[in-house]
């Protein structure tokens, strides 16, 4: 593929930094990289291919210079600047939740619905799903295609990096304070996160669910193109730095054996099956997922309470596959299949 210019908006954040690293490690054909951020971060330096690149001020950047823009600087920034970039001819791949529910903007996981990328022509924007939705659907897509899924019950155990750098620092700081006999002093989260579990991610909705939980419902239905699939989530923040875990329980339309499910998962793109019935024969966020690209699946077993039930344990790096990697994978398909004529 012919090299193209790429802009990374939010280049100094955790996801932006990961995007730049993944562009390099996957040898994405970047001609010139434009790291962008707010005025207070402009002037900082990021490394790409062994060279220092100066972070530019997003507010003054001319997006007509680049055909692809990876956005991960928060919903308000995307709301303001993604349409500006798109109107200048830059296809925006947005990692925030701002555009995900818009009917004319595709919501894409390349292993699940790559064909939806074609709809970028509507507004010049492609939305990246929520990190928990990505991991779950990469694991469930082969099962959904084979036997159908009527209902998903899922409990997530989400790392603090999903909140951002301040949350990573808060967990580290609280852990040190508590081990030294000091009060935890929560600021990012409403309660202590160190040595704790908080069943509250994003704002509470009128129905008692949080917005994070409802994202998993809306996004699953949109990505699969199945408004009838039922999703019942509980999202929990846990004291882990990187890597989300999910206990997933599905009810299938047609019966499927554990052996059939394992075979489908072993052959699935983007999935690594680690499922031995022994101590340590399963993936965890820290030992397998953190810093890795695949979605790991283990604890595959029949639901003893339901004739068409199946249980899985799913883990993935929320900053990589849950955000930065998925965005770069979208860009790869976009460039190879739709933008090849870009000069």
Describe every region a protein language model picked out.
Residues 170, 191-199, 241-245, 250:
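Active-site-proximal catalytic alpha-helix in oxidoreductases
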Residues 10, 184, 188, 204-211, ...:
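A short glycine-/small-residue-rich loop at the edge of a beta-strand within enzyme catalytic domains
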């Amino acid at each position: 593929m012919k090299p193209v210019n790429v802009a990374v908006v939010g280049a100094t954040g955790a996801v932006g930094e990961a995007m730049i690293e993944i562009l390099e490690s996957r040898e994405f054909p970047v001609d010139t990289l434009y790291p962008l951020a707010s005025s207070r971060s402009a002037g900082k330096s990021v490394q790409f291919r062994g060279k220092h690149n100066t972070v530019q001020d997003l507010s003054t950047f001319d997006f007509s210079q680049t055909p692809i823009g990876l956005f991960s600087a928060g919903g308000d920034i995307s709301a303001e600047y993604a349409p500006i970039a798109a109107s200048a001819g830059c296809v925006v791949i947005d990692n925030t939740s701002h555009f995900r529910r818009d009917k004319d903007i595709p919501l894409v996981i390349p292993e699940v619905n790559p064909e939806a990328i074609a709809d970028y022509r509507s507004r010049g924007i492609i939305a990246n799903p929520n990190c928990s939705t990505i991991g779950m659907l990469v694991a469930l897509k082969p099962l959904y295609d084979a036997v159908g899924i009527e209902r998903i019950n899922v409990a997530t155990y989400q790392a603090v990096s999903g909140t951002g750098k301040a949350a990573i620092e808060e967990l580290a700081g609280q852990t040190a304070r508590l081990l030294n006999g000091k009060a935890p002093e929560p600021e990012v989260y409403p309660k202590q996160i160190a040595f704790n579990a908080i069943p509250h991610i994003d704002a509470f909705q009128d129905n008692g669910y949080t917005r994070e939980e409802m994202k998993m419902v809306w996004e699953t239905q949109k990505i699969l193109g199945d408004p009838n699939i039922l999703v019942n989530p509980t999202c929990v923040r846990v004291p882990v730095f990187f890597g989300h875990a999910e206990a997933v329980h599905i009810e299938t339309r047609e019966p499927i054996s554990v052996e059939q499910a394992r075979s489908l998962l072993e052959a699935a793109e983007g999935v690594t099956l680690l499922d031995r019935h022994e101590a340590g024969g399963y993936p965890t966020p820290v030992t397998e997922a953190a810093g890795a690209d695949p979605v790991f699946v283990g604890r595959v077993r029949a639901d003893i309470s339901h004739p068409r039930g199946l249980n899985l344990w799913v883990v993935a790096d929320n900053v990589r596959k849950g955000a930065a990697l998925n965005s770069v994978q979208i860009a790869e398909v976009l460039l190879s299949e739709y933008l090849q004529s870009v000069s």
